[in-house]
Amino acid sequence: MDLVYGLVWLLTVLLEGISGQGVYAPPTVRIVHSGLACNIEEERYSERVYTIREGETLELTCLVTGHPRPQIRWTKTAGSASDRFQDSSVFNETLRITSIQRHQGGRYYCKAENGLGSPAIKSIRVDVYYLDDPVVTVHQSIGEAKEQFYYERTVFLRCVANSNPPVRYSWRRGQEVLLQGSDKGVEIYEPFFTQGETKILKLKNLRPQDYANYSCIASVRNVCNIPDKMVSFRLSNKTASPSIKLLVDDPIVVNPGEAITLVCVTTGGEPMPSLTWVRSFGTLPEKIVLNGGTLTIPAITSDDAGTYSCIANNNVGNPAKKSTNIIVRALKKGRFWITPDPYHKDDNIQIGREVKISCQVEAVPSEELTFSWFKNGRPLRSSERMVITQTDPDVSPGTTNLDIIDLKFTDFGTYTCVASLKGGGISDISIDVNISSSTVPPNLTVPQEKSPLVTREGDTIELQCQVTGKPKPIILWSRADKEVAMPDGTMQMESYDGTLRIVNVSREMSGMYRCQTSQYNGFNVKPREALVQLIVQYPPAVEPAFLEIRQGQDRSVTMSCRVLRAYPIRVLTYEWRLGNKLLRTGQFDSQEYTEYPLKSLSNENYGVYNCSIINEAGAGRCSFLVTGKAYAPEFYYDTYNPVWQNRHRVYSYSLQWTQMNPDAVDRIVAYRLGIRQAGQQRWWEQEIKINGNIQKGELITYNLTELIKPEAYEVRLTPLTKFGEGDSTIRVIKYTGEFHCGFEDGNICLFTQDDTDNFDWTKQSTATRNTKYTPNTGPNADRSGSKEGFYMYIETSRPRLEGEKARLLSPVFSIAPKNPYGPTNSAYCFSFFYHMYGQHIGVLNVYLRLKGQTTIENPLWSSSGNKGQRWNEAHVNIYPITSFQLIFEGIRGPGIEGDIAIDDVSIAEGECAKQDLPTKNSVDGAVGILVHIWLFPVIILISILSPRR
């Protein structure tokens, strides 16, 4: 009966027609690595930790199943410090980081979703290992005097190295290894509140032999092949902390454009200190020139000003630091204001009253600032009626005042304030102020036609306030109705002519704007204000902006366009068009949407329908694409072993897909299949006929033949209906000729445990095995010799009993159907490594199971007994006629020293090399090389029943 079922299944596979089943499934995901990690722990921990050396290439692959094909997204968090996804994401199956750095360690998440069920998420923590060069610093202390002549001198040598994992330190004096307790004058300890980051060597009461060369060795125990690093320090009676001197003044005042040189020299320190320059804020200017302790700034500017510090360090004591402040002369922002007599409630200036003219600039350095006053070009000196003062710098820095007491007609004229710096080199700032009978305070008005001001979104608009008076002050614009920024991002904008120009007006800019006078360049009086209303009209915002409607012929469709917002909201009109053809017009009443129905679709009804909703500002448009195009096919990527190993130079591929929303349009009558070799331009096309209706989730299969090994191909699939072509889907198919499994990956290459056995095979590496493992049995490393590499083994310790079995099942491997009139069946070389060491070794068997046969297992290979502490390799030729599965069976021997292991299982097309095959058919060798012979009648039967291609 099993053989009959097997024949039925095989006939189904051989047919080049169409077959189907529901295959839609939510996503599953797992993360595999490239195998370049120096360690991966996943056995006794709740999380997977992938360890890699800094500078190596990280490569993680997210393997997904599910249909339709899930979308993949890689994200990262910083580890335990943060659970928030970072903004950067990778939308790719493989996450590859070349030359990984320490800050890139953390938890990496792979998220897969296809709209079915919940998204599938898996994570792996990446731990980046590194070891920086160690640094030795020296500190010394001198105790109190004893008996007037003796001083105790103690030296501390501190060794620090940044590392992951924690570093282990060791000390040497010359060639002598220093250990705690080995020398009474030496003490080695870790400071409190540290966790291995540093190790201190304390030399108590220095002795002559303590003056020597000391070495600190930092080690992470060769993890990830990171070598130890060493640093040395020569301790002598001349060892001293650094001291320096700056050969410049403090502060240094210079003019813009000048070159300045700062010189720093060492005056002490052993070993010779190194000198570096830093700036109190920010980085050093890019244009500087450094030469040892000399720093030169060519063509200095105000941006280069600040405090510059020279730091000397020789790792003895504390670094020495000297600083100087560079001041670059500058004069800017000259402005004035007129203050009327404060003892009268009148903002005008009048004969017989006091008037004050104030002048202000920003000066660096402020102590060099001087002012000069002129009237009509002639110098002014302070007198009883003309009082010149300078405001307290703490109250109003950089300000001078000219008080005119008892203003007379002869005082009218032009007053000039000139600001200059004593050091020179900077252009003076000159400010003219006219005092006359026409000098009056400002007044603000808004032209009648300028408020409210109506404009359309996207236009350029000018808001205007008319200012009168002499002199005309600066006008400040701001929002009056809400605390929001102005178009330039500031809270206030300045205008010298009273006009505010706004480019590309948006609807958010509607509202009230305030214009007010500033005290600068005008009268120092209560600000004058005026308001301008801005109304921004914008066309209707509608939904949907675009909607695709797929529907078959003779079916009904209703399109609806809805208004979300508009200004003005009334009166709104609408137009429905198909292309340029006007279908319907109308006006909105109380409803917020308009509809257009199509009762029965035909060829002339397909096309783009536009609904325009219109107001004074413009139109909003809903677009509807009504089409009978079929949706794109959905390629099925979860086919196990889709490559068929046909003949020597060609292969076949089982292409599978489902149809997205097959009932949305007319019945699909065929598919147009296009195929081309990767890198080529020409497509080869053929049609695949479809009989009957396709069901949602139905799996369709078509076998691609005569593909050249090992080329990849691009496949394009287009559904066809009576409407015409639908959307196409393209995928790349690749030849994968050899199966290889080293059991490094999380799901052990889809191997599974047999439910009918007594116990299970176990995945293990030497680095992760139980410390209480049984000695004198089992491997000390994987087949490649790596302590971190994984293999599968049977644990024969108690409670296992003699004769109990553990069975490991391979995934199912597909092969190509064969024709009895063509070449003979393809051969496959099946190979693996096995380890059988221990005095109680039992038996290792390998069986072949063909598709459809659940009870018949054909013995391929067998071995028993102790083979020594080494890995052995086995090769077996197999000639399957249908899909097959391999079974590894380990049988427990008479005692606990009977662990059996396997590693590096491979299946390659073609026979094994003759030198790899056993010389005779013994128990320890191949017992099923010709297992295909008894199946020859089946081949004949199948070949008769199946059509030839």
From Swiss-Prot:
* Record localization: Cell membrane
Which residues form the lipid moiety-binding region (GPI-anchor amidated aspartate)?
Answer: D924
Extract one GO cellular component term from the record. GABA-ergic synapse
Positions of the pro-segment in this chain: 925-949
Cite the entry's keywords alphabetically. Answer: Cell membrane, Disulfide bond, Glycoprotein, GPI-anchor, Immunoglobulin domain, Lipoprotein, Membrane, Repeat, Signal
Query: Which residue ranges does the record assign to the Ig-like domain?
Result: 27-127, 134-232, 242-328, 340-436, 442-533, 540-627
Q: Does the keyword NADP apply?
A: no
- Which PROSITE patterns does the entry mention? FN3, IG_LIKE, MAM_2
Q: Which domain of life is it from?
A: Eukaryota
Which residues are modified by glycosylation?
N92, N213, N237, N434, N443, N504, N610, N703
Q: Which GO terms describe its biological process?
A: gene expression; motor behavior; negative regulation of neuron apoptotic process; neuromuscular process; neuron migration; pattern specification process; regulation of presynapse assembly; regulation of synapse maturation
Q: How does it sit in the membrane?
A: Lipid-anchor; GPI-anchor
Intrachain S-S bonds: C62-C110, C159-C216, C264-C310, C359-C417, C465-C515, C561-C611
**What is the annotated tissue distribution of the protein whose record heads this document?**
Expressed predominantly in neuronal tissue. Expressed in brain.
Signal sequence span is 1-25
Q: Show where the Fibronectin type-III domain sits.
A: 638-738
Q: Which residues form the MAM domain?
A: 739-914
InterPro entries the UniProt entry points to: Cell_Adh-Cytoskel_Orgn (IPR050958), ConA-like_dom_sf (IPR013320), FN3_dom (IPR003961), FN3_sf (IPR036116), Ig-like_dom (IPR007110), Ig-like_dom_sf (IPR036179), Ig-like_fold (IPR013783), Ig_I-set (IPR013098)
Record's subunit section: Interacts (through the Ig-like domains) with NLGN2.
Check the record and name the PANTHER family matching this protein. CONTACTIN 5, MAM DOMAIN-CONTAINING GLYCOSYLPHOSPHATIDYLINOSITOL ANCHOR 2
- What's its job? May be involved in cell-cell interactions.
Protein name per its UniProtKB record: MAM domain-containing glycosylphosphatidylinositol anchor protein 2
* Naturally occurring in which organism (per UniProt): Rattus norvegicus
The record lists the lineage as: Eukaryota, Metazoa, Chordata, Craniata, Vertebrata
Gene name for this UniProt entry: Mdga2
